[in-house]
């Protein structure tokens, strides 16, 4: 965890700009577990147990409006959703009272005692209140029951029973009239139809700790509930999703990751003119293990903040939620499941409350400030804070290092670039090699004795008469021309096509149960290459029909395959430490790089820069190789390999940790190479500059085993900025979507189980979908705008290890641990 003085960067200015304590009062009785309430300009809290106090933030005299009517300590209160009239409901063991604040203020000005309307009496200990969106109904949570009270008639519309423990939170669904969601100390939530009083859905037990808070996000149609141990549970409320779980988040771990990234970035420093907090809130030498109970959840829309304040936050990634905890306030992003900002009470000497027992939050749209009402965990202090979210985010968001980075090449190759040197050297030697080749051709044209059968000297014999010359090119021409015509006539990839979910052909890649390590389509979508654990490389027709072409020669599992951009060559790397380039047409070996050339086995290998280079990773470094394939066939010296490669440059990761994945674009010119390391980082290399350009620390909770870039295809086009998106995945940590321009995670996908085996991921050619394998014998398809999966593809017989989208048609190929290949087609 960072030191308090390191929490805020020099961009934030004075700490007093972030949070101001506007009001402080001390009650004779503790209100640490009382439901507090905030409206746009009013804060409500109990004073001395039975008095309901309303403090108006716009009143310069700080006059309290005190409402009396309860004889027992107030346990809960809630504001209405309408401004005129502004209602507030309060509850105690004796009464549930509804107050009209406008009428109460008028009576106070007239010197009269304000009175409320008793909604109910002796309902029990009320822990939570919530008014409906139209202020017609109030939900009163007393014990394990929920009473739906009509505000106009004070009648009980319905009594909801089913929880096994006290109900701690309740929310009305904004888009479903009559739907109510409740959370309880029984560690589950329930969905009700409060109009009929019926139960719609009941969750299982989520945690070992009680649920304390609820929040419904209308835009993403998600439910967020918080536990006493700092766990956040997120569920989908979309129709047809059946309240499935989207993610589970540990708030403590997320805050630690947030702090670690800032420390490793090295961009955050101490502000020069800030009043720094003390390093210990409880005294010198004392250390207390505090939990992060989620006391309250409230909406936080960072889109209202000026872009200059948000820094590298994208406009699509500003829907967040405020988390009120005992130690501080946190801005949590529902898209990428990350903490965007953290405000610890102990970091501000001006704050009177360092540990909170209850809190309430409300956004003010007029000035984009946030009202926070806190009650001390120990004692009777109650404080009103005014928070500036723009200053908070600006102080903690480090300047983006990726703003100048772009996957599509945006500048010419520099003379000092390894790319320039590799191409320039090739061009300089091209003329000489052509001259030597021409000389060899001239020599080959001379009549030699051993080129034909000879009976004596051979030169005096008459030449043989050609009796019959078969047209051996008929078959190849027909097949090739048909293939080329079909390739040229293929339609563009349908951008608005449906997800390929219809099961198609399924074949076994090998006679025995053999793991499929990797799969990749050719650029024209006609062929599918598969690397197997039995040392073979197979090439299937895209329809998985016919007999596959077999490429044999490796002595280990083939863990990487790659097609060249012109589809003439295939690259394969295996556990035996060798790299082989094959002729895709004849299944012949064209280039062999032995294990003696690499310090460690090759982890990743691919063509790069439109087939100009080979890019591979071995140990802590990746190598850029220039290659030459000799296509001339010499029957005499066919045993001698004339194809060759040359090392242009090698670059190592920061810290010299072994690489686990490597990715670069080959279909168009790009200077960017992405590498993942065993230290859970993703490093960006700029080969135009020949160095590391940026490092993403703590990219996942475990090492990334695959990076997948949005490369599109030659059959469809995307916006140029879309090519800056890439996916990463790690065992047990789902899949993350990143933007190279901001070096930020834009979305986190967690709906598929991958707890022990590295499963593959893939981008669709249109860039709208991402697919991934899973251990539950299913493949999952996500839409880029949603954190939960849109389709779950069944029909597999084992763990789905690899997925690949056809670049020319809406097809998805999957590979399994037992060696099966499965096609999915669009409906």
From Swiss-Prot:
WD repeat start and end residues: 3-57, 62-101, 112-151, 155-194, 201-237, 292-337, 344-387, 502-542, 546-584, 590-629, 646-687, 698-740, 746-784, 788-826
Gene Ontology annotations for the cellular component aspect, listed alphabetically: nucleoplasm
Protein name: WD repeat-containing protein 27
InterPro entries: Quinoprotein_ADH-like_sf, WD40/YVTN_repeat-like_dom_sf, WD40_rpt, WDR27
Alphabetic keyword roster: Repeat, WD repeat
Organism field: Homo sapiens (Human)
Xref: Pfam families: WD40
SMART domains in alphabetical order: WD40
Top-level taxon in the UniProt lineage: Eukaryota
